[in-house]
Swiss-Prot record:
Family: Belongs to the XPG/RAD2 endonuclease family. GEN subfamily.
Protein name in UniProt: Holliday junction resolvase YEN1
Chain segments carrying region Disordered: 62-83, 498-518, 683-702
Keywords: Cytoplasm, DNA damage, DNA repair, Endonuclease, Hydrolase, Nuclease, Nucleus, Phosphoprotein
PANTHER family in the record: FLAP ENDONUCLEASE FAMILY MEMBER (PTHR11081), HOLLIDAY JUNCTION RESOLVASE YEN1 (PTHR11081:SF72)
Biased composition (Low complexity): 500-512
Residues that bear Phosphoserine: S730, S731
UniProt effect for mutating I97E: Mutants show a slight growth defect after treatment with DNA-damaging agent MMS
GO molecular function: 5'-3' exonuclease activity; 5'-flap endonuclease activity; crossover junction DNA endonuclease activity; double-stranded DNA 5'-3' DNA exonuclease activity; four-way junction DNA binding; magnesium ion binding; protein homodimerization activity
Gene source species: Saccharomyces cerevisiae (strain ATCC 204508 / S288c)
Amino acid sequence: MGVSQIWEFLKPYLQDSRIPLRKFVIDFNKSQKRAPRIAIDAYGWLFECGFIQNIDISARSRSRSRSPTRSPRDSDIDSSQEYYGSRSYTTTGKAVINFISRLKELLSLNVEFLLVFDGVMKPSFKRKFNHEQNATTCDDEKEYYSSWEQHVKNHEVYGNCKGLLAPSDPEFISLVRKLLDLMNISYVIACGEGEAQCVWLQVSGAVDFILSNDSDTLVFGGEKILKNYSKFYDDFGPSSITSHSPSRHHDSKESFVTVIDLPKINKVAGKKFDRLSLLFFSVLLGADYNRGVKGLGKNKSLQLAQCEDPNFSMEFYDIFKDFNLEDLTSESLRKSRYRLFQKRLYLYCKDHSVELFGRNYPVLLNQGSFEGWPSTVAIMHYFHPIVQPYFDEEVLSDKYINMAGNGHYRNLNFNELKYFLQSLNLPQISSFDKWFHDSMHEMFLLREFLSIDESDNIGKGNMRITEEKIMNIDGGKFQIPCFKIRYTTFLPNIPISSQSPLKRSNSPSRSKSPTRRQMDIMEHPNSLWLPKYLIPQSHPLVIQYYETQQLIQKEKEKKGKKSNKSRLPQKNNLDEFLRKHTSPIKSIGKVGESRKEILEPVRKRLFVDTDEDTSLEEIPAPTRLTTVDEHSDNDDDSLIFVDEITNSQSVLDSSPGKRIRDLTQDEQVDVWKDVIEISPIKKSRTTNAEKNPPESGLKSRSSITINARLQGTKMLPPNLTAPRLEREHSSVLDQLVTDAQDTVDRFVACDSDSSSTIE
């Protein structure tokens, strides 16, 4: 996996380089007007997907703590152990699902990609790195030069390295390649290291970026790298997909990449991270092929690699830049120059320790320091890696589905692909048919959508745009406008998804018609969000969508112009509603009003003859209902009780004596208020006594008796009291009292006549 410290030193220049994969594709399409083309380090992908795991940790732990964590393919185990040992790799269904998921994401965005596998000419010393013996020997030197000779001959005869291919591939490699063949995805088998071949493709212009976590891609001369393809917001460096760190911010829906543009970084950093500096830094610190120079850590190694006067990186490059198989003397000369360079570097560090490192390091400069330099063969693999000298561009032709702008995906044998995947017993899939249907359609939905034109009658109804929205990623840091594409099955020989679309119910209880969204789901049960910028605005379905939205907006505006019934706001709670039996939306001011007509007072007096004069009687005040039932009918003949409203208490409720006392307190009696009225009988007797003074003893006794009873009482004139009582308090009882008074008066008169006769 190269030197991880390189990523550490580049991190300050990569602050805003961690972006979603979809944004990277969109930005590239905007700037270049085409899809990006990416070379993928296949072994790195297989490691991250989980094909290679259960590594012998004890062997790796023997390396220095500062040494980077290496890929399983670069571990200490030999080829058979790495590929065939039960502890070094796996072909579990989970790894296959992860691999297919990555392929699906690239294909769904219409990205062009090319998988690059390691070849049989991969340096053998990488597999023997952690052996106790020296990593590179004379045998390695012979192997390197013989491999180069055989490599050149094979390309002259066959045009490739097929003559050097191993008789059989490891199991998981065979499985992956068979899957790629069934899906018609092209790939490249490099002659040597896959990273070196990826760099060759990028430098030659065949691809735009390299997708890899291996820093060796920079050492080989790569300039544009996509690093740490994962579902993490933050760039934590390369790791296996099986690792679980609680500190990592995980996003299960979106994939991110870290975009590294080395020329832009060097413009800011002053060319401190060019290829020569990074290569010399890797040699000093230690990489896949050596343990590093003793006594130098990452900071001291970086100081020496970036030193400009003297420029040790350029001197180191001059030693290994030339390569000639026919001139064997050049190799011995190279070794001699290499030893002199090591000695010169040691002496310079000893003399300028404070200037270079800020202090004097006696331990560093002791005898025995600066040991552990790699062999010339190991360094030659970085300066002159074994790659294909003549690249076959057929793998980039549009007959493969991993190249954009072709419709060959319709010709895939989906039945054979389905049976192959079913034989792997993929885990965590509840419905294989649905998973297979959705995965295949999501891979090629964008291509199928872009292939639609007017002659297709707008996709023959297979798909349509139903919604649009802005996808917020990383808390709104990235916003990607997307269209929601609803579609039906459009690939041949693929069973329809088991997800049944919504159907309109025939139940009589259903009163509402389906909504527009429900109708869309019934017609197109599957959906996928695609970035708007990957779809041209002139596309027929895009035009149809915006026309439909305009019609919907006009309908809403028409409905909004219709005047709705104005309703008064509720001004009371439901207590008033329960008490008055009225709706709360009605006007509160009308709640207490009665809908019954006010009854007129009864003008006919009860128990009085019709011929009697009632001119002196008061007409009672109008009566009003005391209890009105709003739910009663107007034609109801039931008895209605009313209250008679009078100005004062009726005289019917008191005796004549009490009535006299009450009358004295009445405010309406304003004549002689201090005079207490007497009964008519007493009044009559008093009058007669005044007219006829007693002359005899009987008459005197009668007069004394009357006077004694009326002592201290002032009498009113008889001609004023009686009419006043009749006028002001004329009622039934008053009439009876008047009749009684007349009767008493007659008896008094008779009594007076009898007294006169006796006398």
